[in-house]
């Protein structure tokens, strides 16, 4: 029995040693924890009105604690409509290498979802924001987390949540953690909908990244929102990559970008919040629905190695500055 015990221990060590030769050593998390997050499934109207009567649900977050001691900075990673994909893992390793822990949320599995690309109506567009604030509650009390240095980063639908989680109005309604995110880093977010008081954002930097060729969530709309935010004196910047389409940082994406005929996009819609809690299709003057004629299919998605590398370089430099890393 002793020899069997020794074999069982030695084999993982051999495998780990082999992996360590391929993965930069600092990219290996010192510890990984899975945390349950108690949240709600809400309609957009419920979210916008602060209505807590949604369906209780438990989602999961993967906390990868970077190598280091004491309390470390954390980047919360929020996936998009396709779920927890390869880019989340890549970013986790890249950030761990800097000495930054990561908390990657899976907002779908606990809700019985795998993706909403082909049916965006399955989940409220802003529901992820509640998940993110609840994740803050988990992190704020964790002994290995510096609660003053928690950054939010999200992709596509998760980028939309990242961007609008900065709104002071939404923080007042839903953030009960006692802390705020130190910065917001949305990747290719949906900026299509003006919300009431949407220029009143947290006094924290916002850095948006997207591609000129994005026909899922056009960056032109984000640039217009950025101009409104700047006019209001906010610290916000947008970085645009001319050759990049949607999801350009996913290393398993199509090369070149390919059409996904079943995926829904609101790129042709003009949606706005007219009265608190009510999203209106500006063309029909009726409440917006994903059955509206403006909703189209077939955006391009694909990996752009050059844009992905440039974005990694920019994000790392930004995080080093905002988190005061040595």
Where in the sequence are the language-model features?
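Primarily recognizes the serine-hydrolase "nucleophile elbow" in alpha/beta-hydrolase
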Residues: 124-202, 213-216, 220
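Serine-hydrolase catalytic machinery in alpha/beta-hydrolase-like enzymes
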Residues: 48-62, 71-141, 261, 290-300
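Short alpha-helix in the alpha/beta-hydrolase fold that links the catalytic acid
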Residues: 218-228
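C-terminal catalytic histidine-bearing segment of alpha/beta-hydrolase fold enzymes
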Residues: 235-326
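Short beta-strand/loop motif that positions the catalytic acidic residue
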Residues: 208-210
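N-terminal cap/lid segment of alpha/beta-hydrolase-fold proteins
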Residues: 21-69
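Sec-dependent signal peptide recognition
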Residues: 2-10
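Hydrophobic h-region of N-terminal signal peptides that target proteins for export
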Residues: 12-20
């Amino acid at each position: 029995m002793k020899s069997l015990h020794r074999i069982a221990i030695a084999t993982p060590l051999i495998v780990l040693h082999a992996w360590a030769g391929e993965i930069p050593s600092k990219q290996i998390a010192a510890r990984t924890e899975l945390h349950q997050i108690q949240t709600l499934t809400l309609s957009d109207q419920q979210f916008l009105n602060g209505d807590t009567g949604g369906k209780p649900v438990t989602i999961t977050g993967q906390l990868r604690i970077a190598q280091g001691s004491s309390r470390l900075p954390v980047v919360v990673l929020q996936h998009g409509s396709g779920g927890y994909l390869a880019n989340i893992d890549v970013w986790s390793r890249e950030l761990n290498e800097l000495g930054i822990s990561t908390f990657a949320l899976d907002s779908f599995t606990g809700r019985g979802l795998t993706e909403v690309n082909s049916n965006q109506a399955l989940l409220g567009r802003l529901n992820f924001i509640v998940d993110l604030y609840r994740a803050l509650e988990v992190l704020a009390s964790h002994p290995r987390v510096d609660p003053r240095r928690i950054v939010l980063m999200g992709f596509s639908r998760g980028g939309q949540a990242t961007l609008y989680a900065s709104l002071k109005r939404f923080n007042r309604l839903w953030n009960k953690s006692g802390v705020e995110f130190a910065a917001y880093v949305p990747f290719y977010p949906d900026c299509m909908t003006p919300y009431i008081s949407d220029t009143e954002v947290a006094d924290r930097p916002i850095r948006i990244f997207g591609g000129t060729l994005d026909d899922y969530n056009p960056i032109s709309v984000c640039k217009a929102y950025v101009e409104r935010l700047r006019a209001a004196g906010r610290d916000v910047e947008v970085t645009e990559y001319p050759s990049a389409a949607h999801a350009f940082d996913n290393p398993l994406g199509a090369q070149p970008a390919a059409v996904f005929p079943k995926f829904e996009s609101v790129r042709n819609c003009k949606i706005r919040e007219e009265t608190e809690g009510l999203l209106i299709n500006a063309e029909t003057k009726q409440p917006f629905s994903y059955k509206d004629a403006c909703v189209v299919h077939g955006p391009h998605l694909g990996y752009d190695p050059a844009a992905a590398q440039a974005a990694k370089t920019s994000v790392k430099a930004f995080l080093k500055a905002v988190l005061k890393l040595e």
